[in-house]
A protein has these predicted regions:
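Short glycine-rich, Thr/Ser-proximal phosphate-binding strand/loop in the N-terminal lobe
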Residues: 5-46
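Short beta-strand-loop/turn "lid" adjacent to the catalytic site in phosphate-handling enzymes
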Residues: 59, 64-105, 131-146
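Short glycine-aspartate micro-motif
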Residues: 5-8, 69-73, 174
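Conserved active-site "lid/cap" helical segment
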Residues: 32-73
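A generic structural motif
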Residues: 22-26, 67-68, 122
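Phosphate-binding/catalytic loop of phosphoryl-transfer enzymes
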Residues: 106-110, 114-174
Length: 174
C-alpha cells in the first residue's frame, strides 16, 4: 500500500532520512559519512550514488520498500533565487544541481530524491530551500550603493517554527 513519505536531508557529514506514515514517524536515521568516505569524490554531486546506496540499505534493513512511498520530499539545494513554496523536482532542477554555481551537500537532495522517485513512478519535491528570496527591496540595502544584500538562510526551519507558533497563537503565518 502506498502510504509513506520519504524525507531526505543530505548534509556535509551525514544524510538524515525519515519515513512518515500520515503524521507519524515510522523510521528515523542519520547516516554518518566520515571524511575518509567522502574524500574520493572530487565534487559534492559525485557523492550521489554513494549516498543513494546508503539510503537504500537503510530502507531495506527497516523493511521499507520504495513502492510503498507516495512521494519523496528532499532538502532543496543552491538553485537560483526563488519564492518560498513546494517545488516538484524536474529535469531542469536536476541539471542545475549537477552543474551548481556553489557546491554544498544540500544539492544532493533533489538529485537523490528524483532518482528514487523515478524508480517507482512517483514525484519528488523540495520545500523552502535555502535560496528562497522574499526580501523586500529596502531589506537589500547595506549602506553601500554597489553592495546589495543577498537572501540565503534556513527558510524551511524558520517557516516551520513560525507556522507552529502561529498555530499556538490561533493565527496564520501567511
Amino acid at each position: 500500500m502506498k502510504d509513506k513519505v520519504l524525507i531526505l536531508n543530505p548534509g556535509s557529514t551525514s544524510t538524515k532520512i525519515a519515513v512518515y506514515c500520515n503524521d507519524e514517524i515510522i523510521h528515523l536515521e542519520s547516516i554518518q559519512h566520515s571524511h575518509e568516505d567522502l574524500a574520493p569524490f572530487a565534487h559534492v554531486q559525485d557523492q550521489k550514488e554513494y549516498r543513494l546506496e546508503k539510503i537504500l540499505n537503510v530502507l531495506d534493513k527497516a523493511g521499507i520498500k520504495l513502492d510503498e512511498l507516495i512521494c519523496i520530499s528532499a532538502r532543496g539545494g543552491l538553485l537560483h533565487p526563488i519564492p518560498g513554496g513546494t517545488y516538484e523536482v524536474n529535469d531542469i532542477m536536476v541539471d542545475e544541481m549537477m552543474h551548481p554555481k556553489k557546491e554544498h551537500a544540500c544539492n544532493l537532495g533533489a538529485l537523490i530524491g528524483k532518482d528514487l522517485a523515478d524508480r517507482v513512478s512517483i514525484k519528488s519535491y523540495i520545500v523552502d530551500p535555502v535560496v528562497v528570496d522574499e526580501l523586500w527591496p529596502w531589506a537589500r540595502m547595506t549602506g553601500l550603493k554597489e553592495v546589495k544584500r543577498v537572501c540565503q538562510f534556513h527558510v524551511l526551519n524558520q517557516k516551520a517554527i513560525a507556522r507552529k507558533v502561529a498555530r499556538v497563537l490561533g493565527k496564520t503565518y501567511e
